[in-house]
Curated annotation (Swiss-Prot):
The modification N-acetylvaline is found at residue 1. It comes from the Eukaryota. It comes from Halocynthia roretzi (Sea squirt). Ca(2+) 1 binds at residues 57, 59, 61, 63, 68. Ca(2+) 2 binds at residues 135, 137, 139, 141, 146. The keyword Transmembrane helix does not apply. GO terms for cellular component: myosin II complex. One of its GO terms (molecular function) is calcium ion binding. This is Troponin C, body wall muscle. PANTHER family: MYOSIN LIGHT CHAIN 1, 3, TROPONIN C1, SLOW SKELETAL AND CARDIAC TYPE. Belongs to the troponin C family. InterPro entries: CALM/Myosin/TropC-like, EF-hand-dom_pair, EF_Hand_1_Ca_BS, EF_hand_dom.
Length: 155
């Protein structure tokens, strides 16, 4: 909870209060969590709901109090941030591919020229091997999908 801003805590308090409006004890049970998940288009099983609660149930009560709710929301925010990282990587891969693919037909000769231009002593057979490994449809070019697949193994 200490990682949250006052504004985030305030927003989470408002959401928490909606969650517990029907609850007699002021905490979120699997029943309340299930209702909200269904409103969000999810259809978790009772087991799924219990596991979600257990992940943040610090005091072992079987329900989620406000502090535990904040922990759950903070973890959700972190997961969303981490999900953005592949988007940035995808954008970088796309930009790199565009830089290599000068004539718009995929990269083949361009890859060889780019590797030669690095100043590294890259042997022709090494470039040929990279092309053979990356060129899944055997058209002597690396298209964008093949490029992305190839780069995943590089990282």
């Amino acid at each position: 909870v200490e990682h949250l801003t006052e504004d985030e805590k305030s927003q989470f308090r408002a959401a928490f209060d909606i969650f517990v409006a029907d609850a007699k004890d002021g905490t979120i049970s699997s029943k309340e969590l299930g209702k909200v998940m269904k409103m969000l288009g999810q259809n978790p099983t009772e087991k799924d709901l219990q596991e979600m609660i257990e992940e943040v149930d610090i005091d072992g009560s079987g329900t989620i109090d406000f502090e535990e709710f904040c922990l759950m929301m903070y973890r959700q925010m972190q997961a969303q941030e981490e999900a953005k990282i592949p988007e940035r990587e995808e954008k970088e891969l796309s930009e790199a591919f565009r830089l290599f693919d000068l004539d718009g037909d995929g990269i083949g000769d361009e890859l060889k020229a780019a590797l030669d231009g690095t100043g590294e002593n890259v042997e022709t057979w090494e470039v040929d091997e990279m092309m053979a490994d990356g060129d899944k449809n055997h058209d002597s070019q690396i298209d964008y999908e093949e490029w992305v697949t190839m780069m995943k193994f590089v990282q």
